[in-house]
């Protein structure tokens, strides 16, 4: 069990992620929110940011540093902290819009549908138990070296895919290739290979990081 902090981005202010400015002894600092202090104290928790595409642009901008650097205010959440977000598609989200491109590029996007039979089973207390595969540090490091050569070779042959901004409005707020998201692919594939995950899962991770076209 890992500590979980759920934050509804749609009802938050920028300072709930960027920190509250305060002046003490002639210097300014950013006081981190309570959820950040709780996660930092734990060191291995999960931040679940819900409804991020109904958060105003100023809040989405404040989320950038949290997502990439794992820093809220002046507080580091710790390398062991994981960040997960959820959003309904803009066409069905109430007052929703596409994610800003800088924020969208900081996530692996996975479309999630909950089967009716799973919901029915969960209503009577039978939610499925999921076993998370394990991998050793040595295996991950080995796979990282191997995948880095594969990825370098691919981008050398397809340099136009190193960075490709979304070309249509339908792709706004989704995954697209940049050096940052290719690094996501490298790390995800290294872990997936070390865990012996199925090919279809690896495909979802790649598409979720750099988009369908890449």
Model-derived regions, located:
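AAA+ P-loop NTPase catalytic core and its hallmark functional loops
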Residues: 1-150
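Alpha-helical lid/collar subdomain of P-loop NTPases
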Residues: 131-214
